[in-house]
Swiss-Prot record:
GO terms for biological process: defense response; negative regulation of defense response to bacterium; response to bacterium; response to chitin; response to fungus; response to salicylic acid. It comes from Oryza sativa subsp. indica. GO terms for molecular function: ATP binding; DNA-binding transcription factor activity; sequence-specific DNA binding. Gene3D superfamilies: WRKY domain. It comes from the Eukaryota. This is WRKY transcription factor WRKY62. The gene is WRKY62. Belongs to the WRKY group II-a family. The lineage of its organism: Eukaryota, Viridiplantae, Streptophyta, Embryophyta, Tracheophyta. ATP binds at residues 259-266. Pfam families: WRKY (PF03106). Residues 7-19, 76-86 have a biased composition (Low complexity). Interacts with XA21 in the nucleus.
Length: 318
């Protein structure tokens, strides 16, 4: 029996001797499953942590936006009428004290000072006989605009040897329009009338009939319509200067005179002219613009740019 006991061996020794794996070892597939399970648990834990962070962020955001979304307390709304009421009471009590209080207690009621508008200025040039007298009354009779004027001054300027006369509209006491009348220093036969401001009254019936009758009679007193009209035009940089010739025959001169009168009455040099004078003025303007090299160049560049813009763009493939 001893021999049998000594020669016997356990099953574990037999399996080890045979080179078999132990019973508790795992296969590679089981290792991968274990790693996947651990990764899923870590992912779930991180998801819960992220949800908690987002919940805290939303809570802080709602806490910050709550004051701006909530209505103002009743005390603040009740305080605003009291401030306006106190300002009104101060103004009723003492105007001087109210002005000082408004500058300190009510700054919102202050308004920035606005710049005063500059008076509108327009110039009319009338060609007259150079042999006429240079006194203000003669010049005023030459430039007829349909208004009544009162002379209030005269002086000689440094750049012109001829005196400049100052007139004020006498049609209405409150009319702010002023007129300056002076002979041109370069051309003695040219009278320059400068108007400042706009009339705040309407034309009288006599003045309206005077201007209308002048335009009507000029169309019939000018003789043949084929004769050249005694009108020349010159345009300055601002486009507010027109020159009319009044030195030729009476009939054609009345047409130009009518243009000056209507120009001064309208205040914008836009007149009710006869068709012949209007056509002649258009021809003069076209001639002046054609002789202006800068204007022609500007029009040429604008037309060229317009033509280039209309050409369709064709891509070039090299």
């Amino acid at each position: 029996m001893d021999d049998d006991g000594d020669g016997s061996s356990s099953p574990t020794d037999d399996s080890a001797a045979a080179g078999l794996l132990p019973l508790f070892s795992r296969s590679p597939a089981e290792d991968l499953e274990e790693k996947l399970r651990r990764a899923m648990e870590e992912n779930a834990r991180l998801t819960r942590a992220l949800d908690a962070i987002l919940a805290g962020h939303h809570a802080h955001q709602r806490a910050l936006l709550a004051p701006s979304l909530s209505p103002p307390p009743p005390s603040a709304t009740a305080r605003a009428p009291s401030v306006s009421t106190s300002c009104a009471a101060r103004e009723d009590a003492a105007p001087a004290v109210a002005a000082a209080a408004a500058s300190t207690a009510c700054p919102s009621r202050q308004q920035p000072p606005t710049a005063e508008p500059r008076p509108k200025v327009r110039t009319v040039r009338v060609r007259a006989d150079a042999a006429d007298a240079t006194d203000a009354n003669s010049m005023a009779e030459t430039v007829k605009d349909g208004y009544q004027w009162r002379k209030y001054g005269q002086k000689v300027t440094r750049d012109n040897p001829y005196p400049r006369a100052y007139f004020r509209c006498a049609f209405a006491p409150s009319c702010p329009v002023k007129k300056k009348l002076q002979r041109c220093a370069e051309d003695r036969s040219m009278l320059v009338a400068t108007y400042e401001g706009e009339h705040n009254h309407a034309l009288s019936t006599q003045t309206t009939e005077f201007v209308a009758s002048g335009c009507t009679t000029s169309q019939h007193a000018g003789g043949s319509s084929s004769s050249p009209l005694p009108c020349s035009i010159s345009i300055n940089s601002s486009g507010r200067t027109i020159t009319l010739d009044l030195t030729n025959q009476a009939g054609s001169g009345s047409i130009a005179s009518c243009g000056v009168e209507a120009a001064a009455v309208s205040g914008e040099l836009v007149t009710v002219l006869s068709p012949e004078l209007r056509r002649h003025l258009v021809e003069e303007v076209v001639q002046v613009l054609k002789n202006d090299a800068e204007f022609v160049e500007a029009v040429t560049n604008a037309v060229a740019a317009r033509v280039v813009d209309q050409i369709p763009h064709i891509p070039v493939h090299l």
